[in-house]
Swiss-Prot record:
Residues 36-59 bind DNA. Residues 14-76 form the HTH iclR-type domain. It comes from Pseudomonas putida (strain DOT-T1E). The gene is ttgV. Represses the expression of the ttgGHI and ttgVW operons. Binds to the ttgGHI / ttgVW intergenic region, probably preventing binding of RNA polymerase; ttgV dissociates from this region in the presence of 1-hexanol. This is HTH-type transcriptional regulator TtgV. Pfam families: HTH_IclR, IclR_C. GO terms for molecular function: DNA binding; DNA-binding transcription factor activity. Keywords: DNA-binding, Plasmid, Repressor, Transcription, Transcription regulation. Induction: The ttgVW operon is induced by toluene and styrene, but not by the antibiotics carbenicillin, chloramphenicol, nalidixic acid, tetracycline or gentamicin.
């Protein structure tokens, strides 16, 4: 093989990786799955090309078939890779999650940003009769959750606009529009705490703060029934900020200046 052939081979390999990444991003934006035709339309590739890439991703469990109904969604290997990459942060933060959950008697979670969504890395579920229960690994729109808002607020403006995309999801009657969200993110940068009041799910409220660690940015969030939120909001915000301080002291911050 001469130098020209080698360069062509490298370029082809890079193109395949880029196409696979675009397909996975499309599936990540549609957690319930997409048909081959829908994927091809979204990424602007021939259906036959999408089929070949999907087959390769499926062999690595990065994509999985939905069953007899057809279509594909992101596979379990992606979550496993994320969890493996986050092993250090999980073990370091776990004791603080437990402590915060016990102090407030509410569900607590640790999350990271994945595109326009948050990925729940770990959680402690409250033992109360009326509580909010959610699984590890769940992906939810960042713009409609407190955990997502603190992570979005940490992004530079150009990156933020790209992360928000052209159209924000409308999940409830309380979901914020772009203008209101951008204004709220500016306030979050000042206060250090974000909230969502029935914006993701009716009856569910959350509060969150940003963890600025040498391992990257994460969000620490309290998720609770809305019926308890108004009376406890000040207490929750104070507890979150204290927990943030404790965690960043123990782990080490990535920057000296808050984003």
């Amino acid at each position: 093989m001469n130098q020209s052939d080698e360069n062509i081979g490298k370029a082809g390999g890079i193109q395949v990786i880029a196409r696979a990444a675009s397909i996975m991003r499309a599936l990540g934006s549609h957690p319930h799955g997409l048909s081959l035709a829908a994927i091809a339309q979204l990424v602007g590739l021939p259906r036959s090309t999408v089929q070949r890439i999907i087959n390769a991703l499926e062999e690595e469990f990065l994509v999985e078939a939905l069953g007899p109904a057809g279509g594909f969604r992101l596979g379990p290997a992606l979550g496993q890779l994320i969890n493996q990459a986050q092993t250090d942060i999980l073990s370091l933060v776990k004791p603080y999650l437990r402590s915060l959950a016990e102090e407030l008697d509410e569900s607590v979670c640790l999350a990271s940003l994945a595109g326009d969504k948050i990925y729940v890395l770990d959680r402690i579920v409250s033992e109360r009769e009326l509580r909010v229960v959610f699984p590890i690994g769940i992906n939810v729109p960042a713009a409609a959750t407190a955990a997502g808002k603190v992570l979005l607020a940490a992004l530079p403006d150009e990156t933020l606009q790209a992360a928000l995309g052209e159209q924000l999801p409308v999940l409830t009657s309380n979901t914020l529009g772009r203008k209101a969200l951008v204004k709220q993110l500016s306030e979050v940068r000042q206060s250090g705490v974000a909230s969502d009041l029935d914006e993701h799910i009716d009856g569910v409220c959350s509060f969150a703060t940003l963890l600025d660690t040498y391992l990257g940015y994460y969000s620490l969030a309290i998720v609770m029934p809305s019926s308890r939120a108004s009376k406890q909001s000040d207490l929750i915000k104070k507890a979150l900020l204290q927990s943030k301080l404790n965690i960043e002291r123990a782990i080490g911050r990535a920057s000296k200046k808050a984003p």
